[in-house]
A protein has these predicted regions:
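Carbohydrate-active catalytic/glycan-binding domains of CAZyme proteins
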Residues: 1-207
Length: 207
């Protein structure tokens, strides 16, 4: 939500429906999060490819767009313009050549954290995370989190609920044709001064 324009701004991965070559960003806006969004077109940030992506908004209103670029080889971090309708600058090219996708970001008690997955199509893989003292600061090397399939999921987004960090992951139906069998998993994240741990639970209740 952009307080200056009073608009909800959506950024999304755009493809043309015929092939997977556009690797672009689409932008849409609406007065409410559940209304009819107005499409404002698509583009490639500074000419770069953009696929799996996420947004992060600071408390002061500064917003960032993070996406898989260069055929998923790198994760790019862009600071957005004040109205969230364009990129203002390219802040980072993270973990170049590591082929990370599905980025998800959260601010914890000690650090900012980013969880991502390797590129294995619909098959789950070992999730990894990194930390930094600020979005625009120096990010750590990648460290493993969860088990070898991230408990059969791929990072979707991270939540801070009353000070508790939660991982929300996509559990894909597989091969694209079984999308109706896909679902979500939610796991608590334990933050320490030494890092981040994903806690597996069969069921969980949150207040």
């Amino acid at each position: 939500y952009n307080k200056k324009t009073n608009k909800f701004v959506m950024w999304a991965h755009f493809e043309n429906g015929k092939n997977y070559l556009d690797a672009a960003v689409a932008i849409a806006t609406c007065d409410t999060p559940d209304g009819d969004f107005t499409y404002h077109g698509h583009f490639n940030p500074y000419g770069y490819m953009s696929r799996d992506c996420t947004l992060y908004q600071e408390e002061d209103g500064t917003a960032y767009f993070i996406s898989a670029s260069r055929d998923n080889a790198d994760l790019h971090v862009y600071r957005l313009s004040d109205d969230y309708m364009n990129v203002d600058c390219l802040v980072h090219r993270l973990w170049q050549g590591e082929y990370r996708e599905a980025p998800a970001v959260i601010k914890g008690k000690y650090h900012y954290y980013m969880i991502s997955s390797f590129c294995t199509g619909w098959a789950p893989n070992q999730g990894k995370y990194a930390w930094a003292d600020s979005i625009e600061g120096r990010w750590s090397s990648l460290k493993e989190i969860g088990d070898e399939t991230t408990y059969d999921s791929q990072s979707a987004f991270l939540l801070n609920v009353n000070g508790k960090l939660l991982y929300v992951g996509d559990r894909w139906g597989g091969d694209g044709d079984k999308y109706f069998e896909s679902g979500y998993v939610v796991y608590p994240l334990k933050e320490t001064e030494d890092g981040l741990e994903m806690i597996y639970q069969d069921t969980a209740e949150f207040e």
